[in-house]
């Protein structure tokens, strides 16, 4: 919300993936920007398609990696290529909400990839693996100039003291983090295998949810 308020004006363009997190388009439209959708390849964000949608009016590119609701991701080589191919005046926002679940060699979190870039914002949240969605708390990384712009428009007291305290405790609890990752891997595989047995198509995922296609399912919801 703050990013859109700070950097968008009427008739600016924002590029998002076809099946991206809905909040990007909501806040972009609230700030009178035009949302441009880049087609995905097999429910995976396509860097080439995103770049094809960029125009002189483009101000922000949002990308969740891994993506919600598809559960897919783009590798570190591709997301770095995206930043390098974008104009320097285009802000790239990398949503790392599910990064704690990722343990793949070709994946890297946005914070490590873009720590030296001045035109990237990386966002993180305590709502997913930490289970603190009700506290509405997260954090972000960006250059000093971007952070200053966000601070100038943020409402006062937008994060409560209990939320801050809980987040500070949670981020140090590595035992909980590792337990949740093991739990996710066990049950995501079980769900994936079960859906395959039921002939229900779903993509493989590295996060804590599955995207399910019921188009070809010839069973009632009770049977499923």
Segments the model singles out, each with a brief description of its role:
Residues 195-224:
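Conserved PLP-binding catalytic core of the aspartate aminotransferase-like
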Residues 30-35:
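A short helix-loop-beta submotif of the ANL/AMP-binding
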Residues 1-13:
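Phosphate-binding glycine-rich loop
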Residues 119-196, 200-203:
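PLP-dependent aminotransferase class I/II
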Residues 29, 47-56, 69-92, 98-127:
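Active-site pre-lysine segment of PLP-dependent enzymes
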Residues 37-38, 60-66, 92-96, 204-206:
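Short beta-strands and strand-loop turn motifs
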Residues 18, 37-42:
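Short beta->alpha connector loops at strand-helix junctions that form conserved
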């Amino acid at each position: 919300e703050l990013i859109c308020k700070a950097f968008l004006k009427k008739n600016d363009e924002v590029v998002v993936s076809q099946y991206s997190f809905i909040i990007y388009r909501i806040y972009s439209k609230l700030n009178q920007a035009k949302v441009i959708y880049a087609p995905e390849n097999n429910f995976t964000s396509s860097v080439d398609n995103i770049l094809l949608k960029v125009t002189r009016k483009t101000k922000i590119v949002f990308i969740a990696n891994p993506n919600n609701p598809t559960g897919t991701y783009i590798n570190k080589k591709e997301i770095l290529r995206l930043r390098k191919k974008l104009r320097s005046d285009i802000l790239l926002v990398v949503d790392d909400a599910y990064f704690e679940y990722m343990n793949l060699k070709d994946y890297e979190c946005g914070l490590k990839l873009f720590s030296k870039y001045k035109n990237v914002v990386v966002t993180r949240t305590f709502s997913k693996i930490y289970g603190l969605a009700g506290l509405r708390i997260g954090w972000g990384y960006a250059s000093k100039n971007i952070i200053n712009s966000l601070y100038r428009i943020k409402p006062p007291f937008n994060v409560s003291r209990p939320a801050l305290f809980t987040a500070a405790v949670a981020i140090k609890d590595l035992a909980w983090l590792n337990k949740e990752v093991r739990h996710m891997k066990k049950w995501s595989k079980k769900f994936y295998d079960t859906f395959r047995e039921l002939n229900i198509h779903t993509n493989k995922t590295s996060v804590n949810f599955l995207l399910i296609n019921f188009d070809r399912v010839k069973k009632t919801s009770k049977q499923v």
